[in-house]
Amino acid sequence: MEKRYLSLANNLINDLLESSSSSSDDEELGVLLNPKTNCLRVNNFVNEVSTCTQAAGFCCNKTTICEVSNLFNVSYSCAHNVINNVVSFLIGLSPDIIKFPQSATEKEIISNEFAAISGFPNVLGCIDGTYISIRAPKKKFVQHTYINRHDTISVTMQGICDANLKFFDVFTGVASKVDDSRVLKLSFIGKELPKLCLPKYHVLGDSAYPIRNYLLTPYRDYGNLTEQEKRYNYKFSQTRVRIENAFGLLKCRFRQLMRLDFHEVETTAKFILACCVLHNVCIDKQDFIEKKEYCVDPASVQEQHFPFEVSDTVLTELDEIKRSQIKSLF
């Protein structure tokens, strides 16, 4: 393991232990971090620090379970069990760590943080999808659905983040051939988003999404945009790039996400979610990586364009009013 990321793994230990708020969680964590399986070291004991470092070190480095077991002088099955147990524990914490703001005060604070970026008003979050490369699924008849537009096998991770790159919502495990607007419809947040954005808020998405009162998109540039529309798009991109940076930071911090070699897509999805939990914990602890390693230039982001359904086109005409009102501010 690279020293830098092993150090990061060690820094995650205390964050992981502190993330459980109740005594029952603490007891559960103790059981998970000290599994009575064939975990053998020289002194026949695996302490919590070693266990956490094994799991976090695996997440933060592009390494294998075999290499982790050799590094910590434990059996392969022990390292495998440790990683699975910590992932399960993190997923149990996810409802408390990855959650959408509910109160009016929370929403106002988040909106003000976004407004401070470029002046774009009433933004509650930024949404997008990203590909995470995986091993080809076992079932050959579905393998082609996991080949993305870059001709690589992957799953899509949909994320919604705040201005500090912290995830509000994560949905993953969907075959990468499915476009972003369809992934949103399939996700749990898809039906809840209109209510969560009441009374005046919205999330920002790229042109892959249909415009909604609660989901604003940029103006498509066919060479005939007005100066006001160009200013709208500029401020929009300056704000929406936060989700690109959130994905970049996630993948930079957890190098295992460069390519996941799990045999089951379900296991892959669980691991991605666990990394997102740790990502949020790190942000809460203000543990950041140098921006130059993950920041994306808004001008370099290529918009995706997909045809919408007829019903979407009708709704778009109604929801265009809000975008026009915001455009008039610029």
Locations of regions flagged by a protein language model:
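Charged, often Cys/His-bearing segments associated with DNA-binding zinc-finger transcription factors
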Residues: 1-55, 95, 292, 309-329
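Short helix-capping/turn signature of helix-turn-helix
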Residues: 57-61
